[in-house]
Amino acid sequence: ERNEIVLNEKNISGCIKMYLDEENLLDRFFILPTIPEMTNIKDFERAIKQINVDYEIQLVRKKDLLKVQSEANRNTPLAISSMVKIIVAACIYKEISEGNIELSSTIKIKAEDISVLSAGIGKQNIGDLFTIEELLKLLLFVSDNTAMDIFIDYLGEDKIEKFLNFEKSKVENKGYKFNFPLTKNIYTEAWCTESNSEQQWRNSAMKKVVWTEGLDYFIDLDYVRYSMNYLLNNSWIPWDDIQNNNVIYKGGSAPGVLSCIWSTRNLEKEDFLQFLFVINKRAPFSLLEELYIFGCANKLLDFYGVLKVR
């Protein structure tokens, strides 16, 4: 048996479909936002405008680049959260190309390396050896903050800035300074200053908006796109080791921040496509809003034949 609850949240709507078992108990349920038609980047922008947000959206299709952005952030970059890890990964690949390190090079985990809110490496790994290849997988697949800090500490802000300046000739200069603090520093200040349990930290990190206080990574999407292209030019990237890797995805999220990139693999192909966006809101996104945004993105990608929405 199926029951349905209608959802209405300001300018977006949807429903909860609940399926009951033979004993009339809840078996499963789905939250389904109402998704408008998606045939181009303007449709996606129009849909995003239904939520009170700042945004930047980019689409590369048939070697043409389309950009749209909200008026409020014309001259300032938005917070991109963990999507910054694509840039850090590209910097590591540049180090590899210059012969300074190898994918097989190892790093021993020290106590001071361990970040907060980490998704992979923890205190149990102190003293363990990780290869650069393993750290790249942790960085890009599970968005591991400790892997990020190890790479930032190895590179130093100078090498990251040098890499970004290398790309700056292709990017409009908005006159801001690159800033890449350790995740341990920025996220401790954001959510972990009180001596509470990690469970309380993680709860705070799901609810408390801090990008408005400058506690995030702020950078133009152009740098993310160029960094992804730099990754694609390498003979091996972490996505090579997983199935169904014809489309690469990396996202980032924090309260009030959503950022994503989808990219096909071959830069030289006529049908090469990249779709990326960053959306900033001064309050946490509701679950319906997040599902709505991703539903709109998936529908647009499905229209272009990149993803199949079931």
Task: List where the protein language model places each region.
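C-terminal and inter-domain tail/linker signature
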Residues: E1-E45
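Structured C-terminal helix/loop/strand segments within mature extracytoplasmic catalytic/sensor domains
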Residues: P33-D54, K67, D158, K208-R310
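Second-shell loop/turn segments in exported
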Residues: T34, E71-I80, G120-I126, E134-L138, ...
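Short, conserved catalytic-motif segment at the N-terminal edge
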Residues: I51-L78, Y93, N100-I101, T264
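Sec/Tat-exported extracytoplasmic proteins
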Residues: A90-N100, A111, L140-S143, L155, ...
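Active-site-adjacent helix/loop patches that line small-molecule binding or acyl-intermediate pockets
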Residues: I126-S204, I219-D222, Y230
